[in-house]
């Protein structure tokens, strides 16, 4: 077949596909209609950089997992706050029935305009999530957590009943349905997951996430979050240093890491990130234990410098602008 005939046949096929499945259902990668990745910021400058595209990609499934009290829900709540700041609509599927509206409000969430569901079982949770995503009205949806998505058969059965693989099958079926819908509606779908230990593993990492393997495959981004050393004022623990690793990334290079402070009752410490990244990029000078910017002394010690940045919003904004400028040049 001649080249011109091939192109005609391809064009006719493309028109037929678009007629049946809608405009944009197939496109050439070089076309103008293939856009740059749209994102929702994470609420952390360091994590935005680690993700490579400036935040959580839209139209993708994200998994955030880690041990208990590592900051998984905090990270998801920050994403909701960022989406709302940009005028987006957010939903929270609270399968754990543990959502704290007062903590969410402190992190910047407009709780009065947040859609929340506390479903009775896993099937109901995922069905509600699918319908919300299918509406095309939701910008971000968080499911907290996969471990709490208990199948209806397990809830209605007796305590000792063995229901092996039910949750894994439920997740696999749900994700097959959700993936295409999430992509078409440009919704960011975040699943929070817990860690378990495999029994009898002698070599390698015994840790695994709940809900089977489906989420590992369908997620475009997987984030491993771990609490590190505590942040103290004398004997009082005020927060913890948190380490994050992007273990899977389909939109940018994976395995990048980020560190930030999570302060109890406040969430991610913005001032702490400005100090750390500013010092790393040479914007903030460190001489001994003193931190300074131009001729302004920020404080002796990191904690004092953090307080200075927190108390001066204009200075924080100026430094943040310089940090973004320096990072974009990299």
Swiss-Prot record:
It comes from Bacteroides thetaiotaomicron (strain ATCC 29148 / DSM 2079 / JCM 5827 / CCUG 10774 / NCTC 10582 / VPI-5482 / E50). ATP binds at residues 66-73. HAMAP family: RecA. NCBIfam families: tigrfam_recA. SUPFAM superfamilies: P-loop containing nucleoside triphosphate hydrolases (SSF52540), RecA protein, C-terminal domain (SSF54752). This is Protein RecA. It is found in: Cytoplasm. Its main location: cytoplasm. GO terms for biological process: DNA recombination; DNA repair; SOS response. One of its GO terms (molecular function) is ATP-dependent DNA damage sensor activity. GO terms for cellular component: cytoplasm. Can catalyze the hydrolysis of ATP in the presence of single-stranded DNA, the ATP-dependent uptake of single-stranded DNA by duplex DNA, and the ATP-dependent hybridization of homologous single-stranded DNAs. It interacts with LexA causing its activation and leading to its autocatalytic cleavage. Belongs to the RecA family. Keywords: ATP-binding, Cytoplasm, DNA damage, DNA recombination, DNA repair, DNA-binding, Nucleotide-binding, SOS response.
């Amino acid at each position: 077949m001649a080249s011109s005939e091939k192109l005609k046949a391809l064009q006719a096929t493309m028109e037929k596909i678009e007629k049946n499945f809608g405009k944009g259902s197939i496109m050439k990668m070089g076309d103008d209609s293939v856009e740059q990745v749209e994102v929702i910021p994470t609420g952390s400058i360091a994590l935005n950089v680690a993700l490579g595209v400036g935040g959580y990609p839209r139209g993708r499934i994200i998994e955030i997992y880690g041990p208990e009290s590592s900051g998984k829900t905090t990270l998801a709540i920050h994403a909701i706050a960022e989406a709302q700041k940009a005028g987006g609509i957010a939903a929270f599927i609270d399968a754990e029935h543990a959502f704290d509206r007062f903590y969410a409000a402190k992190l910047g969430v407009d709780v009065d305009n947040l859609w929340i569901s506390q479903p009775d079982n896993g099937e109901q949770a995922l069905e509600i999530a699918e319908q919300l995503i299918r509406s095309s009205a939701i910008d971000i949806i968080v499911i907290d957590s996969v471990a709490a998505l208990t199948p209806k058969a397990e809830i209605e059965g007796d305590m000792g009943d063995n229901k092996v693989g039910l949750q894994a099958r439920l997740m696999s079926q749900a994700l097959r349905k959700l993936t295409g819908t999430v992509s078409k509606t440009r919704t960011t779908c975040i699943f929070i997951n817990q860690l378990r230990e495999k029994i009898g593993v002698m070599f390698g990492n015994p840790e695994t996430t709940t809900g089977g393997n489906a989420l590992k495959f369908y997620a475009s981004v997987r984030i491993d979050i771990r609490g590190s050393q505590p942040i103290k004022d004398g004997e009082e623990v005020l927060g913890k240093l948190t380490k994050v690793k992007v273990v899977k990334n389909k939109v940018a290079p994976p395995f990048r890491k980020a560190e930030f402070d999570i302060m109890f009752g406040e969430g991610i410490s913005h001032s702490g990130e400005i100090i750390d990244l500013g010092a790393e990029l040479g914007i903030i000078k460190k001489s001994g234990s003193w931190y300074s910017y131009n001729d302004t002394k920020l404080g002796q010690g990191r904690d004092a410098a953090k307080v200075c940045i927190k108390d001066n919003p204009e200075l924080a904004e100026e430094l943040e602008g310089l940090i973004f400028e320096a990072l974009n040049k990299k």
